Each structure stands twice: as structure tokens, then as C-alpha cells.
Amino acid sequence: MALQNIGASNRDDAFYRYKMPRMITKIEGRGNGIKTNVVNMVDIAKALARPASYTTKYFGCELGAQSKFDEKTGISLVNGAHDTAKLAGLLEVFIKKYVQCYGCGNPETEILISKTQMISLKCAACGFVSDVDMRDKLTTFILKNPPEQKKGGKDKKAMRRAEKERLKEGEAADEEQKKLKKDAKKKGSKDSTAKGLKKKATTATGSDEDHSSSPTRSHDGDKAAADDDDDDVQWQTDTSIEAAKQRMQEQLSAATAEMVMLSTEETEKKMKQPTHKDGSTNGSAKEIPNDKPAVTKPSPYEELIGDIKASLGSAPTPSQLKAVLASSTLPPQDVMNAPLEALFGGVGKGFTKEVVKNKKYLAVAVPDEGAQTLLVQAIEAFGGKCNPEALKEVPVVLKALYDGDILDEETIVDWYNDAVAAGKDSQVVKNAKPFVEWLQSAESDEEGDDE
């Protein structure tokens, strides 16, 4: 298939990357039924990123003839016998008016239709918005048959969420790899220090044995020298308490030696202390009554809150919280309520900052749309028992979770409508009203733009 550059002004540019197929036409029929068939109109329209019906209709408007494009078969027909060069010239005019950016000339544009029924071209290369001349005949056809809009809203949000999850998993893998490297380095340093201590102990043992050698050995000097030169000599370590203490004093510094605690003296002191019949030492303690106060066992819900706080104790990760929540056998709503109480219990002013700070843990608890409803209901339940200062920040918290792709606008609006329909007059619902109204107005504006 022969290709040519898009736009007459770029015809001689050998390195121009925007190309389209060269037009192929075919004359069909005779007499009054003669028609011109643009054989590859579908391929040309794909290259221009415009519907094939637009180009076909433009030929009909400019030639004053009837034109028709069949969506099922992809056949483009214009009444009358028309030369290929003439149709190609009209196509260049169409490209200049409805495809190329008026600012940079690139064909990477998208047709936009405003509320006031004005057509404009938005350039993806430079961002320039070009206003189309509304006096042209084709504009009426475009307004009646607007181009298909790209998938937005939920699909975009789902893509962003999937991308964030992918980045989080990558960061978690990197952190785990760094931790393994650190552990390996620590282990290597410990092994090296242990080898150094062992070497010092060996040299100290040798010096001890040199000092404690017998007089007979000093008389046999030649024999001892011969023994030192022998490679098969095996040194033995003196395991007596005195030798061990001496080695400790030689190897450890004064500061370290004070930290070493020998348990032998303490055990001897304890053995010497007299024990009375009542089990007390030195008569200082009195008899402990056998009747111990009954300890109330915490409920499963309180145990879950305790487990969550324990998992968030030192170097917490979202995966740890996810494992704790997955292991719980409580109802789903209780499982969702527990993280809020564990994370934000007792928080007053600054509730929103805490939510933004810990939103990664909330994101783990909300894997799907059903869990979003549970989270909104958990916020409502938490608002009934939280600090009044935190209660005022409920709408800001909802917006923070909405901006963080943890809650969708549909979930928030549906929850609010259900609460109002059920006659709930809680302060959480009242405080959330301005934010819900803002969501609804923004949604209606988007629908107006689409129309």
C-alpha cells in the first residue's frame, strides 16, 4: 500500500512520521446511477483519526452530490464520476480544516464539542485549542453525529489505581531486597568479629600455656624448640574458671567488662537468703491471698483492634495489616470498623492529616467497590463516637479519600442518598452534605460537557 505524508505542506518531507494511504477510487455504474467508490476510505480515516463518514460527507458537501458511507461494509460512495486527483485535493482541504492543529500543524488533534455547540480541535502535541469555522456545511453533520468519546471516569480511575498498586508492589519488593542486603552485611560483619575474637582467644591460650609451663620443660630447651617447629602440635584450651576469667579480662575492655554479668555470685546470694514458710524472703512480703480478681476477657472485636495496633507497632507495612484483616472471622463491617479505631482512636484536630498519612493502610482494606461502601459506613460509625473536632473534618476526610482513589463518587453519593432516605440525621451525614452536593454538581457538569 502506497503511503503519503498527511498535509499538503509536508509532501516533500522524507522524514515526516505522520502518514496515510494514497487514495484509490473506482467508478461504478452507468448513466444517472454512476457513482465514485473510494475503495480505501476506512484506512484513510483511521490514519487521520476521524470517522470515515466525516470525509465521505465532506466530499458530498463540496461537490454538491449525495454521498453515503455504510458502517457495516465500509463502502464509501459519492454520486457522479469524480477524478481521483479532485477528491484527493478535497481531502487535503478537509485535513487542513478538521485534522491539523492551527498552531503547530501536527495532525494529533481531537474533536471537542462544547455546551454551546461549538467545535474545536485540541492538539495533543502542543496543547493548542483551534476553533473550527462553524459556517462550514460539515459542522452541522458533526454536531448531529459527534465522535465517540474515549473511555473516562471509572476506567481512568481503575487504570490509575492499578498503576499505583503496581508501583506499591515494586516499592515493597525493593524494600525487601534492601532489607535482605542489610541482613547479609550484618551477618558478614558478625562472622568477621567472631573470627577475630576466636583468633585472639587462640593467641591468649598460647600465652597462658607458655606462662604455666613446668620447670622440667625449661630444662629441656632443645626438645621444646623441636616441638615448636613440629606442625602436628595440637594446642588445648584451659577450661578452668580462673583461665576463663583471665581470658575475659584480656579480651574485653574495661567498659565492656563491667557490662558482663556472671550469674554465679547472684545465684549464691539467692541461695543464702532465708525463705520463710509463707514463701516471703527476709519477712518483707506478706501472704498473698489465693483469691485473685477475675480478669474480663476482651471481646473478639477488641482483640482485632489490639492485633491491628500490634501489627502497626514497629516498621509497619500495608501487607501486615492486610494479613491481620484477612485472618479475622468477624463480620465484614466490624473488620472495616476496627482499622479506623486502631489508627484514629482519640484523634481530634488534625484528623484529615492523620487519614492522609495512613491512607495506604485504608487502601489495603478496600480491595473492591463493596468494601468502599463498608468504609463509608465505618466512617459514619466512627463519627458517632469520635472527638467533636474530628467530626467537623468528615467532609475533608471524604474528599481526601476520593482524591486518593480509595472512594468513588458513586459510592459516596449512594451512601448519602440511602442515609437521607432512611431518615438518618446524624452529624456525620449533615457534615458530609456540602461535599456530596459538590460531587453531584461536578458530575452534572461532566455530563453536560459530554452532551
UniProtKB/Swiss-Prot annotation:
Organism: Zea mays (Maize)
Chain positions recorded as GTP binding sites: 29-36
Job of this protein: Catalyzes the hydrolysis of GTP bound to the 40S ribosomal initiation complex (40S.mRNA.Met-tRNA[F].eIF-2.GTP) with the subsequent joining of a 60S ribosomal subunit resulting in the release of eIF-2 and the guanine nucleotide. The subsequent joining of a 60S ribosomal subunit results in the formation of a functional 80S initiation complex (80S.mRNA.Met-tRNA[F]).
PROSITE patterns: W2
GO biological process assignments: formation of cytoplasmic translation initiation complex
Residue span of region Disordered: 143-233, 263-299
Molecular function, one GO term: translation initiation factor activity
CDD domains noted in UniProt: W2_eIF5
Entries under SMART domains matching the protein: eIF2B_5, eIF5C
Family to which this protein belongs: Belongs to the eIF-2-beta/eIF-5 family.
One Pfam family of this chain: W2
Composition-biased stretches (Basic and acidic residues): 147-178, 208-226, 266-279
InterPro entries, per the entry: ARM-type_fold (IPR016024), IF2/IF5 (IPR045196), Transl_init_fac_IF2/IF5_dom (IPR002735), Transl_init_fac_IF2/IF5_N (IPR016189), Transl_init_fac_IF2/IF5_Zn-bd (IPR016190), W2_domain (IPR003307)
Keyword GTP-binding attributed: yes
Name of the featured protein: Eukaryotic translation initiation factor 5
Name of the coding gene: EIF5
